[in-house]
Amino acid sequence: MIDFLDVQASTPDIRISVDKVGIRRMKFPIKIGDEVAILSADLYIDIPQTRKGADMSRAVESIQSVLSRPSINLESLGIEICKEALGRFNYASRVEVKINGEYYKKSNGGYDEISLYIRTKCGIDGNIENLTGLSYEAITACPCAMETTRALISKDIPDSENVLYYIPTVTHNQRNRTKLIVSNNAGKISFWDIYKVLESVQGKPLESLLKRIDEGKLVYEAHKKPKFVEDVVREVAFAAVTLLPLSDDDMVIVSSDSEESIHPHNAYASMKKRALDLKKELNL
């Protein structure tokens, strides 16, 4: 009789350590209040040069074990999965977890689609790095085209100059997806806190159902505060360091991606800075 062989534990033909091995896109539902989010997880470990492969089932078990607990804190989900995996993979020195997903938040216009992000790394040295964030689509209006059309209108209608200085004028607008991710090593910053930071700059997510007055208000408000993607990134970063309980070494990562309505390309801006560096630039 041939015994079962632990192939993964055998010595590889080529003895080189592997930095990252694991599973990708393991999907699972998780309840957030009265709604359910569908998340997708990647889990990676490193393996030494003396080991042929990783026990992939342990990656699945690590995720399932945490999800089976009676209460789950979404903000520290990545931390708990990392710790669980580090205990199961006794030959790994570090674990990395990436979680993405879509959460549909009930609103007056149906459901707001919000993308969630969790990025966690932990090691046998006890170090933990946990980043959490979200993004959603909102509307922006271009300030450059607005000032150009303001000048053009004043040439066509000279008597309008006095009024034109005080009202938003014609410009193009676009769907804009802005993402905010921050350090959250203690899991104390809620996704709702991050949402409120984005909302303070971008307003609420775009909705499928808009009645006439709501549509008018949405467009009017966007044109009252026209923004480049650069403006969006700066305003979100400023709101993050003033509204969130971030320590000096915590990271603030912001990106803004606009689907330009008058161009066949997108406009994009991003920044990645420590909270301390942002505060220094802002003289806070």
From Swiss-Prot:
Keyword terms, alphabetized: Hydrolase, Iron, Metal-binding
Pathway: Cofactor biosynthesis; 5,6,7,8-tetrahydromethanopterin biosynthesis
Keyword Methyltransferase tagged: no
Reaction catalysed by this enzyme: GTP + H2O = 7,8-dihydroneopterin 2',3'-cyclic phosphate + formate + diphosphate + H(+)
InterPro entries linked to this entry: GTP_cyclohydrolase_FolE2/MptA, GTP_cyclohydrolase_MptA
Domain of life: Archaea
Record's cofactor remark: Binds 1 Fe(2+) ion per subunit.
Named cofactor requirement(s): Fe(2+)
Site (May be catalytically important): C142
EC number: 3.5.4.39
A GO biological-process term: tetrahydromethanopterin biosynthetic process
GO MF annotations in UniProt: GTP cyclohydrolase I activity; GTP cyclohydrolase IV activity; iron ion binding
PANTHER family cross-referenced by the UniProt entry: GTP CYCLOHYDROLASE MPTA (PTHR36445:SF1)
Family: Belongs to the GTP cyclohydrolase IV family.
Subunit details: Homodimer.
NCBIfam families in the cross-refs: GTP cyclohydrolase MptA
Function of the molecule: Converts GTP to 7,8-dihydro-D-neopterin 2',3'-cyclic phosphate, the first intermediate in the biosynthesis of coenzyme methanopterin.
Name of the protein: GTP cyclohydrolase MptA
Organism encoding this protein: Thermoplasma volcanium (strain ATCC 51530 / DSM 4299 / JCM 9571 / NBRC 15438 / GSS1)
Lineage: Archaea, Methanobacteriati, Thermoplasmatota, Thermoplasmata, Thermoplasmatales
Gene assigned in the entry: mptA
